[in-house]
Regions:
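Hydrophobic/aromatic residues positioned on beta-strands within the core alpha/beta folds
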Residues: 92-94
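Conserved phosphotransfer microenvironments
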Residues: 57-81
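Helix N-cap/capping motif at the beta->alpha junctions
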Residues: 31, 37-43, 70-73
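Two-component/phosphorelay signaling modules centered on CheY-like receiver
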Residues: 12-36
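Negatively charged, flexible loop motifs adjacent to catalytic sites
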Residues: 85, 97-101
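Acidic, metal-coordinating helix/loop segments flanking the phosphotransfer/catalytic sites
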Residues: 19, 36-55, 62-65
Length: 135
């Protein structure tokens, strides 16, 4: 079986960290993972509304304010859970912001809040694997 994962973050270093964690997931699940990367909110929304994913890893703060259709990550999460093929897709919401309000909003839309600070690749990989297996 093969899994399809969307990694949406404007920071290339953060996308690489998620990629490393997903390599560990591949070993845990003993299955292949196709990783689709996006760097803007506009590109991310286009993927979320048109393609089915087994897991979504979503940033909050995209630096594409200059693009028409720009959305913050929390708005992308809300839209994904309301329309399109990813309503029930497990979604990890990554943010350097440790606001309780943001965390509450993420949980309201069935997302899993994942702080960028203290990112432990092995623990994160296990979280990703657990969510993919349950889907």
């Amino acid at each position: 079986m093969s899994y399809k994962v969307l990694v949406a973050d404007d920071d290339e270093g953060q996308r690489k960290s998620h990629g490393f964690a997903l390599e560990v997931v591949t070993a845990i699940l003993e299955d292949e993972i196709e990783i689709i990367e996006t760097a803007t909110s506009v590109e991310t929304w286009a993927k979320i509304k048109s393609e089915q994913f087994d897991l979504i890893i979503l940033d909050n703060d995209f630096k594409d304010n200059n693009l028409k259709g720009h959305l913050p990550g929390i708005a992308l999460l809300q839209l994904a859970k309301k329309e399109g093929p990813n309503k029930s897709t497990p979604t990890f919401f990554c943010s350097a912001d440790a606001y309780d309000t943001l965390k509450s909003m993420v949980e309201k839309y069935s997302g899993i809040y994942l702080p960028k600070v203290g990112y432990d690749i092995e623990k994160v990989a296990q979280l990703f694997a657990d969510k993919i297996k349950k889907k």
